[in-house]
Amino acid sequence: MGRLLALSLLGIALALLGERLLALRNRLKASREVESVDLPNCHLIKGIEAGAEDIDILPNGLAFFSVGLKCPGLHSFAPDKPGGILMMDLNEENPRALELRVSRGFNLASFNPHGISTFIDSDDTVYLFVVNHPEFKNTVEIFKFEEEENSLLHLKTIKHELLPSVNDIIAVGPEHFYATNDHYFSDPFLKYLETYLNLHWTNVVYYSPNEVKVVAEGFDSANGINISPDKKYIYVADILAHEIHVLEKHPNMNLTQLKVLKLDTLVDNLSIDPSSGDVLVGCHPNGQKLFVYDPKNPPSSEVLRIQNILSEKPTVTTVYANNGSVLQGSSVASVYDKKLLIGTLYHRALYCEL
């Protein structure tokens, strides 16, 4: 009787594991292939060889790149090189990516930047917020951008128990931001288990010097985040659920879900086209290729444009798609004055003139 019970429990456990594995493959879109959608007048950006996970562009055309991200279990083309912040002036005829100097006292050796966001104060001071993973921990760094010196002055490091696994950030004040946690746990093994079991425990946190709180939760894996041009709505990408959530922002900074847009791809970072309000999305057509790297069958890239996201039927178009022969693992796309920048999780970055 005991053996029969043990065998029954083992069978149930194996069936559950098999079901979870199949569900994970579906969430990763493990069988999906992408058809190429090419853009003319594109070239790879010199100096970006190991990823530009996030990009943010100021209204004056200065673009910031978060480069060199490293995560446990994730492929890296430069595993021993610290990350950094690069800048490109898109007003130049042939813009180049230049690394910004960082003020003394900041630990550059462990700099591991992830999501980034800029905020321009009423006195025109530019702040750069950077999600950082020094030694695979979680902090948010606030810098002041000093344009004349092409440098960043480090102002503050933020750590908080409600920020255990920060992915992306959108600044809404000089020390105020919304941030996504892509996992509930910070321990790598528990992160893998959480993803495998599909617990939907990830969230969005609002941070200010006076208040820190969870303002949205229940995501499979909350990832990219941005804000509408009128500052009334927050957009959140749920990468493994293939969704973009539109949330209304209230005066107390709480969020209320307004709608969910379902897509057929893994949605990463979100950018806003300042000329139209369209949402540009860096996507991973096949997540399994992204996380299990094979140079003979590399991860593909995909960029979507979403028009009228607040309407009942938003228009979704594919701006760019590549099977990995040019660009592997696109994570972000940002546009300025008919110039498109596409960054990747750990590969190169692309500059296109539209």
Swiss-Prot record:
Reactions catalysed: a phenyl acetate + H2O = a phenol + acetate + H(+); an N-acyl-L-homoserine lactone + H2O = an N-acyl-L-homoserine + H(+)
Post-translational modification: Glycosylated. The signal sequence is not cleaved.
Subcellular location: Membrane
UniProt GO BP: response to toxic substance
Active site: 114 (proton acceptor)
Entry keywords, A to Z: Calcium, Disulfide bond, Glycoprotein, Hydrolase, Membrane, Metal-binding, Signal
Cofactors, names only: Ca(2+)
Residues bearing attached sugar chains per UniProt: 254, 269, 323
Disulfide bonds: 42-352
Sequence positions that bind Ca(2+) 1: 53, 167, 223, 268-269
GO MF assignments: acyl-L-homoserine-lactone lactonohydrolase activity; arylesterase activity; metal ion binding
EC number: 3.1.1.2, 3.1.1.81
Membrane topology term: Peripheral membrane protein
EC supergroup of this enzyme: hydrolase
Residues that, per the record, bind Ca(2+) 2: 54, 116, 168
Superkingdom of origin: Eukaryota
Gene3D superfamilies: TolB, C-terminal domain
GO (cellular component) term, any one: membrane
InterPro entries in alphabetical order: 6-blade_b-propeller_TolB-like, Arylesterase, Paraoxonase2, Serum_paraoxonase/arylesterase
Cofactor note: Binds 2 calcium ions per subunit.
UniProt family annotation: Belongs to the paraoxonase family.
Task of the protein: Capable of hydrolyzing lactones and a number of aromatic carboxylic acid esters.
Quaternary structure, from the entry: Homotrimer.
Protein name per its UniProtKB record: Serum paraoxonase/arylesterase 2
Organism the protein comes from: Bos taurus (Bovine)
Gene: PON2
